[in-house]
């Protein structure tokens, strides 16, 4: 049984603890060690884990020095992903890091260099990539039966209120200390659904990003953005559109529509199900046999890699890099974040009961974007502003110019 050592047991890391305990019951992996920087804060959980045979350490360095783990997990805040993953890889460990791997393309490439130098690998926890449904869709596209992927689009409306933004020091922020986090719906909460499209289009010749055009907006009292439209054009000519917002009261679960030369794909996140329709009238359906297990699948597949049963993580740094590049170029294209004026905003309530900033008409805009493939400015939203595409070729460092650095509050 593969032994995990993870950094943290509170916040989002508490989910990893639960998922690993489920995998332990199934005989696939177990939580052998955990880093808990503030054991007094998590006293009950530390006691419970110790009773289960999990060793608890005050620092990652102490856990790495003691050994006894096969994979190091990093379910921490965005700013800590790269330094902690690099520390573990330098010590000889393979790593699974939570998504996104980083906020900037230079950090991803630094970590890729660590992987090359150490011979270790770093998997990234984009959960749907590890699911049988997305893998099945990737196989269908790679087979050529659908022809070239022409267009893909996804729209997501996930209400997020004051409690969401108060849950940690970097939620809704551009930076944590001196490190960029660029938090926002496309960067973090709905990142999976941008990554899914980038992962699927990578089966095509010319699947690399050619340019990005984006509109980033802020309605709430945060530093970063809470609504976004991101258009990605690939070198092969495919157009991908990701539209998302936290500024609404009605939940719109992710739906992805894909148009190909010889058919189409309809995918829904709620039950991780897909329908493939071919131009000749054939239809195939795939439902996830256990959609509730989607969150634990990265941990399970990485354990199989560590055990020598699978050749490589389904989502490594190479697969996760395009998402980070798309986010960085989105900020470059938008030139910062546009504020939605108070005349278009109202107060609402999130599902957790906390106060929420609501943009009037956002639900309808998201539905229109999914149906038409148009961006907020193209749909005539009164607060929206059009932007220009930015080329990906040669881009290697965020922010790419001083004007953007100033717009985001410093270099």
Regions found by a protein language model. Give the residues of each.
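Contiguous beta-strand/loop segments that form the cofactor/metal-binding neighborhood of enzyme cores
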Residues: 182, 188-313, 324-332, 341-411
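Short loop/edge segments at beta-strand edges and connector loops
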Residues: 58, 97, 124, 213-216, ...
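Beta-strand-loop-alpha-helix segment that lines the small-molecule cofactor/substrate pocket
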Residues: 66, 71, 77-78, 82-129, ...
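Short acidic low-complexity segments
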Residues: 55-65
């Amino acid at each position: 049984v593969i032994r995990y050592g993870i950094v943290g047991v509170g916040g989002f890391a508490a989910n990893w603890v639960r998922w690993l305990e489920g995998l332990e019951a199934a005989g696939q992996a177990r939580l052998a060690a955990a880093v808990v920087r503030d054991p007094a804060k998590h006293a009950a959980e530390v006691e419970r884990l110790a009773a289960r045979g999990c060793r608890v350490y005050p620092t990652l360095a102490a856990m790495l020095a003691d050994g006894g783990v096969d994979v190091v997990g990093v379910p921490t805040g965005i700013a800590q992903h790269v330094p902690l993953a690099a520390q573990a890889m330098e010590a000889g460990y393979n790593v699974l890091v939570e998504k996104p791997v980083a906020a900037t393309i230079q950090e991803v490439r630094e970590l890729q260099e660590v992987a090359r130098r150490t011979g270790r690998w770093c998997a990234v926890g984009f959960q749907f990539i590890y699911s049988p449904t997305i893998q099945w869709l990737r196989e269908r596209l790679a087979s050529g039966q659908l022809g070239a992927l022409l267009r893909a689009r996804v729209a997501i409306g996930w209400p997020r209120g004051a409690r969401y933004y108060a849950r940690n020091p970097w939620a809704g922020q551009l930076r944590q200390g001196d490190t960029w986090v660029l938090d926002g719906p496309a960067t973090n909460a709905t990142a999976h659904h941008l990554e899914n499209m980038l992962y699927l289009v990578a089966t095509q010749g010319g699947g690399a990003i050619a340019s990005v055009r984006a509109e980033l907006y802020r309605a709430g009292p945060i530093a970063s953005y809470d609504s976004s439209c991101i258009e990605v054009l690939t070198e092969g000519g495919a157009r991908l559109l990701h539209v998302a917002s936290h500024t609404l009261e009605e939940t719109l679960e992710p739906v992805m529509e894909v148009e190909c030369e010889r058919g189409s794909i309809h995918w829904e996140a709620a039950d991780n199900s897909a329908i493939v329709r071919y131009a000749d009238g054939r239809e195939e359906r795939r439902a996830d046999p256990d959609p509730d297990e989607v969150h634990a699948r990265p941990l399970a597949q990485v354990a199989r890699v560590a055990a020598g049963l699978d050749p490589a993580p389904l989502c490594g740094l190479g697969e996760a890099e395009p998402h980070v590049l798309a986010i960085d170029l989105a900020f470059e294209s938008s030139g910062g974040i546009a504020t939605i004026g108070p005349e278009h905003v109202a107060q609402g309530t999130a599902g957790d009961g906390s106060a929420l900033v609501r943009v009037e008409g956002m639900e309808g805009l998201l539905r229109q974007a999914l149906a038409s493939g148009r961006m907020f400015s193209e749909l005539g939203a009164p607060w929206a502003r059009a932007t220009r595409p930015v080329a990906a070729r040669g881009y290697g460092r965020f922010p790419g110019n001083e004007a953007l650095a100033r717009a985001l509050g410093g270099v």
